[in-house]
Structure formats: C-alpha cells, structure tokens
Curated annotation (Swiss-Prot):
GO terms for biological process: determination of left/right symmetry; glycoprotein metabolic process; nerve growth factor production; peptide hormone processing; protein processing; secretion by cell; zygotic determination of anterior/posterior axis, embryo. The record marks R132, Q133 as: Cleavage. Its cofactor is Ca(2+). The gene is Pcsk6. Residues 680-898 are annotated as: CRM (Cys-rich motif). Glycans are attached at N240, N882, N900. It holds the Pfam family S8_pro-domain. This is Proprotein convertase subtilisin/kexin type 6. One of its GO terms (molecular function) is heparin binding. Serine endoprotease that processes various proproteins by cleavage at paired basic amino acids, recognizing the RXXX[KR]R consensus motif. Likely functions in the constitutive secretory pathway, with unique restricted distribution in both neuroendocrine and non-neuroendocrine tissues.
Length: 937
C-alpha cells in the first residue's frame, strides 16, 4: 500500500517488494514477496476470532466468605477472595482445567452451577483491550520534534495553538493538585522514575496482573509497557527538579494499577476499578475495546457494578471520578458510542484536538464526549512531551491517551480548590467551563439550555483556571433523579435508505417526586435492533428542545449481523434542557455495496432513560411564604393593600358557637378555639410548624429547631444541625446523624476537612497531629503527611537526610548503599540516583557498564546511564547499534552484527541482490533473506 504522505528526510525506507529495487526479471523465486504482500488481504478475510476462556470464574455466593470457601472446595475450586468491593461476588480458580481455551469448560467441576448456594457464575473470557495511543508512522520518525510543552504556552507569540487550557493561570492562583490522589489504570508505572518518584503513592497502587503491591511495568526489548508511565507523567510529574516535564497537577499524589499486562477479564477490570475507592480520588484510563471500526463492547456485569459502587460509595460518598480516553479509531471509521466505557454516565469521556484546532486523524465522534484537550495530529504537528520507560523522557506521546490524564490532572486542581465536589459536580463544572475556542468542527450547535456542543469535542477545550474558580464557589447540585420512559416494544421494519421515525411523549415522571426530571444531564437510549450488516445503520435522537444527537454513525468495517441487544447509547448534548415533551428516534439504513439491500433490519424495541434533577442545578429559590391563616405573632404585620373602588360585599357567615373551656397551658393571653396546643390563638413560649403541618404551641423547640424569642417561634436550623443558636450554617451546636460538628467553625459537615478527622462516637471533627495533613479515627493515624514528613505505618515521620532512606520496619532513617546518592532502600538495587563516578545499570549503580552495555549522558541526572547494546552485539560504543564485537554465531558487517549462517537454497543472484541493496542492515529483512546468504567477507 502506498504511504499516506511523502516521506520525511532521513534514511531510505525499506523496499516494498524485491521487483522494485533493480532485480532483473530473471531473478529467482519472486513468489516470496507476493506472499508477503498478500498476507494482509488474506488476514482481513478471516472470520472474527472465537472467545478465549480462562480457568477463572466469577461466582455469586450468599452467606459470606466461609460459605464461598466451602462451595469452592466442594467442586474442586480455589476461592481467591472477594472481587473488589462487590459483596457476595468471589473469584474462583480451577487448576485442573485449561488455562486458555476456545471452548467453555466441561466436566464434573461444572456442577458448580447447580449448587443451591450459587446464584450466578461466569467463566471468564479474555477481553481485548488496547492502549489508546495513536500509531506512529515510521516514515516520519526523523522529523524534528519540539521538546517544549507547547500546549502549556499557547499565549506565546509564535505558538500555533491560539487558545490556552489556562493551566498556568490555575497554578498562579495557588492550585497544583495538593492532597489529591490520582491513579493510572494501565500497564504499570515506573515508580522509581526521577520525575514520578517524589509524588509516587504506594497506597494508591496495586499490581492486579501480579497480585502484589508493586505496579512497576514488565520490561522487555520492545518497551511495550511504557503507556502507563507516559500517562502518569502528564498528571503529576514533579516540578523544579530539572528533569523531563512539569505535570499538570505537579503536587498531586500519583499511583498506578497494573492491569493491562495480562489477560483482561471482567474480574480483572472490576478489581482494578475498586482499588481503595475511599483513598483514590480520580481514576484515569486510556484504553478500551478495539478501535477497529467493527467492535461493539463494554464493561461486563462485574465492572458495571464496580463503576456503580465507586460513584455511590467512593470518596466517602462523594463518588469516585473516572476519566476515560474517547478512542483512536477515527481512521477506521469507528464511533465511540460502540464503546461501553466512554458511553457510560459514570465516566468523563475526553476527546483530542491538534495544536491548530483541527480534528486529528484518530478522533472518534460521538454524543457522549464531554470535553477536549490538546494532543498530537498530523506528522507535521507536535506531539506531547512526558515521562517514558527506563527513566527517560519522550516527545512522542499521542492520541486520546494523552487527553484522559490531562483532564485527570486538571480535575485534581479543581478538587484542591473544593474537595467536596461530587462526581456529578465535576461533570457539571466541565460543561459550564469548557469552551469551543478555535476548535474547528462543522457540527457546533447551541442546545436548548444555551450550551455550545459538538460530536467531535463535546463542550469544548477544558479551561483549568475557569474550572478552579467555579469549583471554589460551587454549591453541590441537587440529587440525581432517573426517569425511565415507557419502552416501545412494537417491532418495526427499517426501510432501506429512508428514515424510520418513532416518538416517545413523556412527562418526565412528573407524578413521582423521587423520579421526576425537569433539567437534564445524561440521556440514554436502550435499544434492540436485528440487522444483516450492523455497520450500515445510523441513529439520531431529537430532544423536545430540538437538539439532534447522533447516537451512531455508519461504520464501513462493521459487517456483523448481530445488530444490537439492549445496547445503551448515551448523549450529553441535551445537558440543561427541559426533559418533558416529545422525543424522536430516527433510524436510517444506508446499505453498502457488499450487502443485498432486499434484506431489511428490524427495530425490536427502545426505551428512553432520563437522568437529571427536579430543581435547577445552578439556582436556589427562596421558599414562598404561606398565604394561609397563621397564628398571630408578636411582630408587626404589613398593612393590607388598598383596593381601588368600593369593597366587595362580604357574605355574612353563620355564627359559630364560641369555645369557653380551659385552654392548653402553652396558649397565650388571646385565648384559644379548643383545649389542645394546636388550637391556641397565640403562645406563651414558642409556636412550632405552619398551617399545613398544624401549628401548635410548645414550651421548648425540638431537635433541629431553635427558639426565636422575639417572634416566639421555633425556626428550623441549617441543614445538618441537630441543635443550633440560629439559621446560619455557622451557628450549629451539635449535628444530625451522618454529619460531624466542626467545633472551630460551628458547622456540620459530611466530611471533616484536611487536618481534622471524624470521631464517630462524639460526631465531632477533631484536630489531627501537627505532622498530619490527613488522618482517620485517631489524631496520629495518618493517611497524608505535611511537607517535611513521610508516612510510615500510619504515622508521620520526619523526612530523612540525603544519602539515607526511611526504614518502615525500624521506624528510622537508614543509610543508603555506598553506590547510591539517593535511594528507597538499603540494597544497591534500590538506588534512585548514583553516587559520584558510578553509572546506573539494571536498577543498580555500577563503577563501569557491563558487557553488552554502553554509557550515555542523561540530561538532568548527575550520573551516566548504561544502555543495552543491540541484541547481537557483544560490545558497542556510543550507540546501541554501533557494534564493536559480535556474539558467537554472528558476523560484523559495518557496525551491525549479522547471522553467520548459510542455506543451500540461496543462489548467487539472490545473495548479490541482498548485498547490493544492503538489506541485512535493515532489521526487518534479517529473518527473511540474510540467513540464506554467506555474507562474511
């Protein structure tokens, strides 16, 4: 296939086929090259791969861990424990079945599903999950790359990006992510990287693939597990250390969950999403199902429950924040609505734009995208600078993989400004503060609530300064309501080319106060369609305000005949609009040339799920005063308005018999209409309630009220106060259940602020130890320490001097190994920086690089780093490919080591072609041709 753009200056690209490089027509065996060229076409015609089953099961067993252990043992399984935070769900393992098989397991152990204590089980399938980094085109590897962080400096005179994300402006206001914890769900992070180590948080890290607490990536020659380390640097690379870059939240804590470097199953994803939800604030994920233009996939049953647990229970009930990359399948015509992770109401789906504000070639369009950041673009546009594997830096990070950690870092700045933001508050803030700026898209529209929105960029480019300023004064939005409109289960044929329209008229659950939705947030369409070629479908939703959301675009590569079964499409384009009215669903079938147009699809059923609030999310209305008859109070009343003209003739009521009995002791001097406390005309002490709740006289006000002696009324305390001295939130004396009394401010809070902890027995916020930034249960039981202290066994210990490390076993500072300048432990393998005259090799400091390595200067490091020579070199100088000696079985050709091997089937003409075209110097061709020729001499 010809290249998509002219090659950049540099080394000559490898030949495409033998016949195009001077080989005569008589050259032998050209069929070898034809076979190679034909392979992609053959592979594309293969049927989709069959599912791969593992020897792991997810099982729901009631009765607790003991019951699960007994059930597992009875059927030959091992119970590996509860799955994350999901009660009654357990991870079973069977050692006597195939580790990986295309057939689901059979045998006596399958009787497990008939056990009466087993409510549900699922043999785990391997899920394909790909890292969302745009593929590099080797034609442009030698193009110049800007080494500065251009996306932080768009205001510079010569910058091509005209609009700022205003990260520096947020920093200038004092927000750098302090006390916020972000975790990267990926292939691990290099915790000893000099730019990550200062902010690395072991408590926010775990290795799900290896089942231990070290999230370090697996190292190999290809460095394929670099993705998580790159994402982590964008969030929280340390500042002012003369190394690599500055992270967006450079004072935030950064952790890593290693979960992509192995079989990814529903259990693996659920465990990863549920790691320490009350400690980790933000989870960032730059991966998902294949972006191949034909896959429809999303979270399984367990992962969905983990998402729900996180938003309900995470961050002490405020909700975990999940940030997701929207996908890189633009070149394949993919649509991110077919990705159940970015299409979820629980995730913040983030898109990308180029430095010029253009649509990147990898971008996927869909209605669930919330916001956008800068990232890479065409080969001539700059990429993103960040940390890289083996303590390096890179200026080549690309794709929407960049955008998710960028937004995670910006949200960390907002959480520092206001740590009481809920997961929905954060989404509202992004909607309010993101802006179209100079982002170019033909589909920008203003929705019914006045928000400008696009399928490419959501609500636009994130604005860090606007986000922190809005967060600082933010009031929590009202509670979320969910209204399910009646499902339309009438099957309808989908006519070819024409548009099938069906409507749903809803009052948005106005009859149910706990479900009523007036102002929209997310709108979900749950739909089932049968169709001979799924990729020919287009689906739109039109709101009562007229906003049109594209739920699905045509996908040329999706030839599946599976259609959709209860698939949920989500749109945020109706955010802030009124929910009540007529909704229109449009389904269009545009048949491709490879399909018989006479075969029609069928819309089986669809339903509408509305999420939002019953009250306006951004305004508070004062309650109207009751116009009904009230008890006479000892305060002056307003004079009634004078009506123009003669007053109307009042009807003369029948005379009622006047009460002459004894009044209640709490009745005042104006008497009563009966003997009870709710029949007084005025009160001795206080009146309680109103005309709707039968106002009565009381001697003292109950809990939740205070006595207004001037008005002789019981007035309600501020929300959360149990006893108080006034209506203000700062006049609380004690708090209701679920709140804690902050004695220094006399307020009632659901979470104690930094520096205080919640005492459950007294329901008080008490001060942590002076060394603690955050603590739990006790003054000295720390989770975060102040500057100058380190966390050890729940206590804050003073930081150690250079050349020493903190020994958590002995609770003191210990000496580093003599080869280390700085370290994390006593052995030579635990150095961070090396002592003078030592080099860094394989995580150790050595006096000289070993055989097969060469020394290289690293900017910002006080020592050299030993780099590995090419795999065939015994030794090299200055570069990995500049071999000076070769391993046994290899011959030196220039600066390369080539296999010293002959084969009887290579004739002189073929070998001459190999030599003349210097194919053996190109690694790609070593296996194809070099082993067939004797090249020595």
């Amino acid at each position: 296939m010809p290249p998509r753009a002219p090659p950049a200056p540099g080394p000559r690209p490898p030949p495409r086929a033998a016949g195009r490089h001077g080989l005569s027509p008589l050259a032998p065996r050209p069929w070898r090259w034809l076979l190679l060229l034909a392979l992609p076409a053959v592979c594309s015609a293969l049927p989709p791969p069959r599912p791969v089953y593992t020897n792991h099961w997810a099982v729901q067993v009631l009765g607790g861990p003991g019951a699960a252990d007994r059930v597992a043992a009875a059927h030959g399984y091992l119970n590996l424990g509860q799955i994350g935070n999901l009660d009654d769900y357990y991870h079973f393992y069977h050692s006597k079945t195939f580790k990986r098989s295309t057939l689901s397991s059979r045998g006596p152990h399958t009787f497990l599903r008939m056990d009466p204590q087993v409510k549900w089980l699922q043999q785990q399938e391997v899920k394909r999950r790909v890292k969302r980094q745009a593929r590099s085109d080797s034609l442009y590897f030698n193009d110049p790359i800007w080494s500065n962080m251009w996306y932080m400096h768009c205001a510079d005179k010569n910058s091509r990006c005209r609009s700022e994300m205003n990260v520096q402006a947020a920093w200038k206001r004092g927000y750098t992510g302090k006390n916020v914890v972000v975790t990267i769900l990926d292939d691990g992070i290099e915790r000893n990287h000099p730019d990550l180590a200062p902010n690395y948080d072991s408590y926010a890290s775990y290795d799900v693939n290896g089942n231990d607490y070290d999230p370090s990536p697996r190292y190999d020659a290809s460095n394929e597990n670099k993705h998580g380390t790159r994402c982590a640097g964008e969030v929280a690379a340390s500042a002012n250390n003369s190394y690599c870059i500055v992270g967006i939240a450079y004072n935030a804590k950064i952790g890593g969950i290693r979960m992509l470097d192995g079989d990814v199953t529903d259990v693996v994803e659920a465990k990863s999403l549920g790691i320490r939800p009350n400690y980790i604030d933000i989870y960032s994920a730059s991966w998902g199902p294949d972006d191949d233009g034909k896959t429809v996939d999303g979270p399984g049953r367990l992962a969905k429950q983990a998402f729900e647990y996180g938003i309900k229970k995470g961050r002490q009930g405020l909700g975990s924040i999940f940030v997701w990359a929207s996908g890189n399948g633009g070149r394949e015509g993919d649509h991110c609505s077919c990705d159940g992770y970015t299409n979820s109401i629980y995730t913040i789906s983030v898109s990308s734009t180029t430095e010029n504000g253009h649509k990147p070639w990898y971008l996927e369009e869909c209605a669930s995208t919330l916001a956008t950041t800068y990232s890479s673009g065409a080969f001539y546009e700059r990429k993103i600078v960040t940390t890289d594997l083996r303590q390096r830096c890179t200026d080549g990070h690309t794709g929407t993989s960049v955008s998710a950690p960028m937004v995670a870092g910006i949200i960390a700045l907002a959480l520092e400004a206001n740590n009481q933001l809920t997961w929905r508050d954060v989404q509202h803030l992004l909607v309010k503060t993101s802006r179209p700026a100079h982002l170019k898209a033909s589909d920008w529209k203003v929705n019914g609530a006045g928000h400008k929105v696009s399928h490419l960029y959501g609500f636009g480019l994130v604005d860090a300064e606007a986000l922190v300023l809005e967060a600082r004064k933010w009031t929590a939005v009202p509670s979320q309501h969910m209204c399910v409109a009646t499902a339309d289960k009438r099957p309808r044929s989908i006519p070819v080319v024409q548009v099938l329209r069906t409507t749903a008229l809803t009052n948005a659950c106005a009859d149910h106060s706990d479900q009523r939705v007036v102002y929209l947030e997310h709108v979900v369409v749950r739909i089932s369609i049968s169709h001979p070629r799924r990729g020919d479908l287009q689906i739109h939703l039109i709101s009562p305000s007229g906003t049109k959301s594209q739920l699905l675009a045509k996908r040329l590569l999706d030839f599946s005949n599976e259609g959709f079964t209860n698939w949920e499409f989500m749109t945020v384009h109706c955010w802030g609009e009124k929910a009540e009215g007529e909704w229109t669903l449009e389904v269009q079938d545009i048949p491709s040339q490879v399909r018989n147009p006479e075969k029609q699809g069928k819309l089986k059923e669809w339903s509408l799920i509305l999420y939002g609030t019953a009250e306006h999310p951004y305004r508070t209305f004062s309650s109207h005063q009751s116009r009904s008859r009230m008890l006479e109070l000892s305060v002056p009343e307003q004079e009634p308005l004078k009506a123009e003209g003669p007053p109307p003739q009042a009807e003369t009521p029948e005379e009622e018999e006047e009460y002459t009995g004894v009044c209640h002791p709490e009745c005042g001097d104006k008497g009563c209409d009966g003997p009870s406390a709710d029949q007084c005309l005025n009160c001795v002490h206080f009146s309680l309630g109103n005309s709707k709740t039968n106002r009565k006289c009381v001697s003292e006000c109950p809990l939740g009220y205070f006595g207004d002696t001037a008005a002789r009324r019981c007035r309600r305390c501020h929300k959360g106060c149990e006893t108080c001295t006034g209506r203000s939130p700062t006049q609380c004396l004690s708090c209701r259940r679920g709140f804690y009394h902050h004695q220094e401010t006399n307020t009632c809070v659901t979470l104690c602020p930094a520096g205080l902890y919640a005492d459950e027995s007294q329901r008080l916020c008490l001060r942590c130890h002076p060394s603690c930034q955050k603590c739990v249960d006790e003054p000295e039981k720390s989770t975060v320490c102040k500057e100058g202290f380190s966390l050890a066994r729940g206590s804050c210990i003073p930081d150690c001097e250079p050349g020493t490390y903190f020994d958590s076993e002995l609770i003191r500072c210990g000496e580093c190994h003599h080869t280390c300048r700085t370290c994390v432990g006593p052995s030579r393998e635990e150095c961070i920086h090396c002592a003078k005259s030592f080099h860094f090799q394989d995580w150790k400091c050595v006096p000289a690089c070993g055989e097969g390595f060469y020394p290289e200067e690293m900017p910002g490091l006080p020592h050299k780093v030993c780099r590995r020579c090419d795999e065939n070199c015994l030794s090299c100088e200055g570069s990995s490919r500049n071999c000076s000696r070769c391993k046994a079985g290899f011959t030196q050709l220039g600066t390369s080591c080539i296999t010293n091997h002959t084969c009887s089937n290579a004739d002189e003409t073929f070998c001459e072609m190999v030599k003349s075209n210097r194919l053996c110097e190109r690694k790609l061709f070593i296996q194809f041709c070099c082993r067939t020729c004797l090249l020595a001499g």
